[in-house]
Amino acid sequence: MAIAIGLDFGSDSVRALAVECASGAELAASVEWYPRWREGQYCDGANNRFRHHPRDYIESMEAALKSVLASLSAEQRADVVGIGVDSTGSTPAPVDAEGNVLALREEFADNPNAMFVLWKDHTAVEEAEAITRLCHQPGKEDYSRYIGGIYSSEWFWAKILHVTREDSAVAQAAASWVELCDWVPALLSGTTRPQDLRRGRCSAGHKSLWHESWGGLPPASFFDELDPIINQHLAWPLFTDTWTADVPVGTLSAEWAQRLGLSQTVAISGGAFDCHMGAVGAGAQPNALVKVIGTSTCDILIADKESVGERTVKGICGQVDGSVVPHFIGMEAGQSAFGDIYAWFGRILGWPLEQLAQQQPALREQIKASQKQLLPALTEAWANNPSLDHLPVVLDWFNGRRTPNANQRLKGVITDLNLATDAPALFGGLIAATAFGARAIMECFTEQGIPVNNVMALGGIARKNQVIMQACCDVLNRPLQIVASDQCCALGAAIFAAVAAGVYDDIPAAQQRMASQVETTLQPRPAQAQRFEQLYQRYQQWSISAEQHYLPSAAKAEKAPQSQAALTH
């Protein structure tokens, strides 16, 4: 029986999953945390800098793969036919002429600018705004029209420009820049040199301004106008061709075959972003909105080319032919914070406990156990008394806003507090905020003529916290399907590996056998949905008002009258 392995590189850890190709049975899984990241190395949260050392990825991947393989029998290990890879994104890094990430070299070993710039790094806000302005110049080609019309600080070129401006040593040493989801398959197949490395359609189309209609990347003149420093240090074009993730980039290199005890015939599929492969693992069909929920969310919708036509959807994170399933248009949206908002509130409430633990070391374990119960206790308390009459209205922009209309200058806003607001009520407001953000994304599609036939949710929060999911269901006022697998992203990567290895002819055929099932379907509660509708309208009014306070200073005065009117309706 052929076995495929999926690798899912998340923000905190990497997951490896072995899947039987014929049945979709999940045979073994392993999760390995990134050791340097776990210690907070190379990050500066106050300044929105989040970097991953490449050794974190390499060491954790090897440990996860070896753990999974150790759980298989010798016969099963011999049946491994392919490895697929997904990752967060945009998470690019500078590489040298051999394709080594610069931080793997001694002189750059502790330089954060020589590492992978994690998706949620927002140090490049000004660079992103400059790219957006350049794309919208009258009379010129709008290279942002297939990525929603706004270039984000979370994306490829903004990060490259920021690091190139900030660090001349890295700029001089970098032969190219590579997305994590493209670099790992190249590492495993021994094809890391920039001229050998295959760039994925997913990362290139959604984050790098690549599109077939203008021949790939924007012309050199575009980057010269943005800032000549890019073309001074990097050869244009950085790349030309892209590949969908079902196409193998090669087979397992001799080095990695020896390290893992696998055959060199194991196919390595192309890479893609985690949420895109998660949608495939969830078995998504056209016009299903799939919410991959974790620290943030990524929302994926696929549509057939004929139904989309020449339409461009504004305010999303891109529409790319083949970024999810080959021959379909993949559309991406998302919330910059979801689980991270709940974790923030837990840290706020846990601060006194941390102080007590320092003062009373003997109570440390008991206090640690109490901290772990904070959020479950808050969830239960709000579920037992879910009053919506005095619910704080919160804007879920704690890490900026990804969709609709990316804006990483935005901050979280909490409104409608009074002296009776307690911790469960405020936590309920945070739950509602994440649900409101989810609805805003759904409406971004439907109001522009892209139908949403059903909504699916996957990930740990989706399966383990029905209170939060029911609130989302009520706010959306639609049935909400909860996907059974906890490991849909890794499962999706395994599905691509199976196709790359030739076990199946295409992704839909592999999905029929390997994709996860729906575990349960939640239904909206009419009374709650009606009350949430009123609160959602207030959320929208506050959004209009609050956003004006985070505009670049030159635009604030011009927008002021609109913000004052928003809350008088």
Swiss-Prot record:
EC main group: transferase
Known catalytic reactions: D-ribulose + ATP = D-ribulose 5-phosphate + ADP + H(+); L-ribulose + ATP = L-ribulose 5-phosphate + ADP + H(+)
UniProt GO BP: L-arabinose catabolic process to xylulose 5-phosphate
Pathway info: Carbohydrate degradation; L-arabinose degradation via L-ribulose; D-xylulose 5-phosphate from L-arabinose (bacterial route): step 2/3
Keywords, alphabetical: Arabinose catabolism, ATP-binding, Carbohydrate metabolism, Kinase, Nucleotide-binding, Transferase
Gene Ontology CC annotation, any one: cytoplasm
MF terms in GO: ATP binding; D-ribulokinase activity; ribulokinase activity
E.C. no: 2.7.1.16
UniProt-listed NCBIfam families: L-ribulokinase, PRK04123.1
Family the entry assigns: Belongs to the ribulokinase family.
Protein name: Ribulokinase
Organism of derivation: Klebsiella pneumoniae (strain 342)
Originating gene: araB
